Amino acid sequence: MAGQMSKFRRPEQLDLLPYIAKWLALAGLVALLAGSASALFLLSLDHATQWRETHPWVIWLLPVAGFAVGLAYHLIGKPVDAGNNLIIDEIHDPKKIVPLRMVPMVLIGTVVSHLFGASVGREGTAVQMGGALADQLTHVFRLRREDRRVILMAGISAGFASVFGTPLAGALFGLEVLAIGRMRYDALFPCVVAAIVADQVGQAWGVVHTHYVIGEVVPVQLWSVMAVVAAGIVFGLTGLLFATATHKLGAFVKRLITYSPLRPFAGGLLIAVAVWALGSNHYIDVDKYIGLGIPSIVQSFQMPMAPWDWLGKMVFTVVSLGTGFKGGEVTPLFYIGATLGNALAPLLHLPFGMLAGIGFVAVFAGAANTPLATIVMAMELFGPEIAPLAAIACIASYLVSGHTGIYHAQRVGHSKHHRPLPEEIRLSDIKQFHAQSESASERKVTLAGEEK
């Protein structure tokens, strides 16, 4: 009898139905919230950018705007000041619900930063809004610890997908950004649903994403592969430089200026003076280095550009983010990668549009440690033809950038290289770990010498 019953055991696929129904509903709700928030943000950003471009004198108010944003965070925003790192930390080690105030504060702070001329991006804002809004559902539905982790990841995916119009890359980003070398497949279905629906919600609100055309893509041959590997190494080192410079400047400014609202005030003053000083230079169009810089990114696919444009954007972005202006790192990284690829193309005998497109994603891959998301992003933005060469560059960039990144809270799930690192160590703790290891090695050598 028992043998007969085993023959009629319920198929395990039926057990998926409650799971699918649950996460279709939850991820769909996350997507509705995150997609709507991203739409409001992007439409506001468009208006802010248009107004700033027609009123160039407003750059002189950037220090005042920076002080205002810094003061708001100083008075009521300290619990959410960590931004993306707070979301990542809560996924790894859930403690308390992300405060809802993160949403209006980062939205207004980023729009104000763009309105007055800071060089910041938009991904960080969308991810923070998506994560914070998703986490409010933890209260509403009394989600368990593991479900809370998954819904936060879905919020990240929804925010990323809706702000860039790349649903598949957004889904992978939410899975991949948490830890180097490891992904959580238990969140794959919710992240994919949230990303796809959030992108559609944004479009339903009237959001139109930039369309990029890269032109000719060379065939995959030995010479093109070698050239792209070389470019990928440069892209990875550039991502490393960006992340390191931003973190080091931020730490230096915190030591130098103890009152936090004065940090973006000082940064805004420095940027305004630099724009004024360089504005009379006939060789440098400094206006390209403030704001998002989307027109320059589009131009990098169409014609040769000044070989120093990537460096100019990096300097203005590092100063903006390092002194406390709100916004993301990713769009500036797109700009840096695209213009650097444009500059490298003649040296490597590759079409500048193609290498600009590869640089667009590869610098981001190295700086964020998300090679899979960026490979898929290349296909979503530029077409499938670029996939093989983009994959080579993104992987090279990811490996060369080492265990650094723009997200301090990112963990090491699996080391990139053979040099051992403790599992789950935060990127911000690696330097201290190496210092302790070297100190322990020196003590061993000293003790061995004394014993002899």
Swiss-Prot record:
Signal peptide: none annotated. Its main location: membrane. The chain crosses the membrane at residues 23-43, 57-77, 97-117, 160-180, 188-208, 222-242, 264-284, 315-337, 344-364, 386-408. InterPro entries: Cl-channel_core (IPR014743), ClC (IPR001807), ClC-type_chloride_channel (IPR050368). GO terms for cellular component: chloride channel complex; plasma membrane. The keyword Transport applies. SUPFAM superfamilies: Clc chloride channel. It is found in: Cell membrane. Induction: By fluoride, via a fluoride-responsive riboswitch. Pfam families: Voltage_CLC. It is a multi-pass membrane protein. Keywords: Cell membrane, Chloride, Chloride channel, Ion channel, Ion transport, Membrane, Transmembrane, Transmembrane helix, Transport. One of its GO terms (molecular function) is chloride channel activity. It comes from the Bacteria. Transports chloride and fluoride with similar efficiency. Belongs to the chloride channel (TC 2.A.49) family. This is Chloride/fluoride channel protein. The gene is eriC.
